[in-house]
């Protein structure tokens, strides 16, 4: 194409020619482009970041991009797809086989963001050691950690588990009952932990929690721990376990537990299921009393 042009109005004046038909050339707008040299200068940095954080990129792809695509295509959430797999591959009434089936599905099919077998062994061992009469779990999710706790409870033990999302809670309820645990042993409460904790004593006859598992949103851990303290639900010697304290992390919760003087703290270092290079951990707190 030619250079853009337009007519210029005539210039009147004595001794000047008529320029009414003169053409005025207008330069074409320049499009800003990055110099190839600058782009090449950034290439080593980009490659370094991709290599260093490749595990996080893989996790992002599996937990966000692929999961969202499958949600749209199937019309089901990942927890619902996982339960459908369990129904066709696991043995009803066998919680151990159900847990193994979930692990297999998460590693071979779709990443479930569950506790996984390594953390699961830590959780079961601590429940067996403490032999709590009553356990409170905040964050049921699909019911994986719920089954771990229920398997390790002493005879007559009771587990209350709280899940804020009704649709996720419906899946967890079916999984718990499929494993063979009735409502007298494992009771699932649908609601936010912030609303449920103040009602535990009056509505659910929970006067004390010998062991608490925090497995919901790490940013809510500190708030919920202080709510448990405020409502006197933690007896002296109670154990509080908190998952995901390193990834995505709960720094304010850990700082409070270490500095308030009411807890003895220990950290069990682990990795994420299927992503062992991404470091995480379970915090174990032992409550000394109100002080």
From Swiss-Prot:
LRRC51 and TOMT were originally considered as alternative reading frames, LRTOMT1 and LRTOMT2 of the same LRTOMT gene in primates. Interacts with LHFPL5, PCDH15, TMC1, TMC2 and TMIE. Interacts directly with TMC1. The interaction of TOMT with TMC1 and TMC2 is required for the transportation of TMC1/2 into the stereocilia of hair cells. The chain crosses the membrane at residues 31-51. PROSITE patterns: SAM_OMT_I. Its EC number is 2.1.1.6. It is an enzyme of class 2 (transferase). It is linked to Deafness, autosomal recessive, 63: A form of non-syndromic sensorineural hearing loss. Sensorineural deafness results from damage to the neural receptors of the inner ear, the nerve pathways to the brain, or the area of the brain that receives sound information. It comes from the Eukaryota. The keyword Nucleotide-binding does not apply. Belongs to the class I-like SAM-binding methyltransferase superfamily. Cation-dependent O-methyltransferase family. Keywords: Catecholamine metabolism, Cytoplasm, Deafness, Disease variant, Endoplasmic reticulum, Hearing, Membrane, Methyltransferase, Neurotransmitter degradation, Non-syndromic deafness, S-adenosyl-L-methionine, Transferase, Transmembrane, Transmembrane helix. Changing residue 52 to W: In DFNB63; uncertain significance. S-adenosyl-L-methionine binds at residues 137, 139-140, 145, 163, 193. One of its GO terms (cellular component) is plasma membrane. Coiled coil: none annotated. It holds the Pfam family Methyltransf_3. It catalyses: a catechol + S-adenosyl-L-methionine = a guaiacol + S-adenosyl-L-homocysteine + H(+). Catalyzes the O-methylation, and thereby the inactivation, of catecholamine neurotransmitters and catechol hormones. Required for auditory function. Component of the cochlear hair cell's mechanotransduction (MET) machinery. Involved in the assembly of the asymmetric tip-link MET complex. Required for transportation of TMC1 and TMC2 proteins into the mechanically sensitive stereocilia of the hair cells. The function in MET is independent of the enzymatic activity. This is Transmembrane O-methyltransferase. One of its GO terms (molecular function) is catechol O-methyltransferase activity. InterPro entries: SAM-dependent_MTases_sf, SAM_O-MeTrfase. One of its GO terms (biological process) is developmental process.
């Amino acid at each position: 194409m030619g250079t853009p042009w337009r007519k210029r109005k005539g210039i009147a004046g004595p001794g000047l020619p008529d320029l009414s038909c003169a053409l005025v050339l207008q330069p074409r707008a320049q499009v800003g482009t990055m110099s190839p040299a600058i782009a090449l200068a950034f290439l080593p940095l980009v490659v370094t970041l991709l290599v260093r954080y490749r595990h996080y990129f893989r996790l992002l792809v599996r937990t966000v991009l692929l999961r969202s695509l499958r949600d749209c295509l199937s019309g089901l959430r990942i927890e619902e797809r996982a339960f459908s797999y369990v129904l066709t591959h696991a043995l009803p009434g066998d919680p151990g086989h159900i847990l193994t089936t979930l692990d297999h599905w998460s590693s071979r099919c779709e990443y479930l963001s569950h506790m996984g077998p390594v953390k699961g062994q830590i959780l079961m061992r601590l429940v067996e050691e403490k032999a709590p009469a009553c356990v409170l779990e905040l964050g049921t999710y699909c019911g994986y950690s719920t089954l771990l706790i229920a398997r390790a409870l002493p005879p007559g033990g009771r587990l209350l588990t709280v899940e804020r999302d009704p649709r996720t809670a419906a899946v967890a309820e079916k999984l718990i009952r499929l494993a063979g645990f009735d409502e007298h042993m494992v009771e699932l409460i649908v609601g936010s932990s912030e609303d449920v904790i103040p009602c535990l004593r009056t509505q659910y006859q929970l006067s004390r929690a010998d062991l608490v598992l925090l497995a919901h949103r790490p940013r809510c851990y500190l708030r919920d721990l202080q709510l448990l303290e405020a409502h006197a639900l933690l007896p002296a010697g109670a154990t509080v376990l908190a998952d995901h304290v390193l990834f995505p992390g709960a720094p304010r919760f850990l700082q409070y537990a270490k500095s308030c003087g009411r807890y003895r703290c220990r950290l069990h270092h682990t990795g994420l299921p299927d992503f062992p290079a991404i470091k995480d951990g379970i915090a174990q707190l032992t409550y000394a009393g109100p002080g």
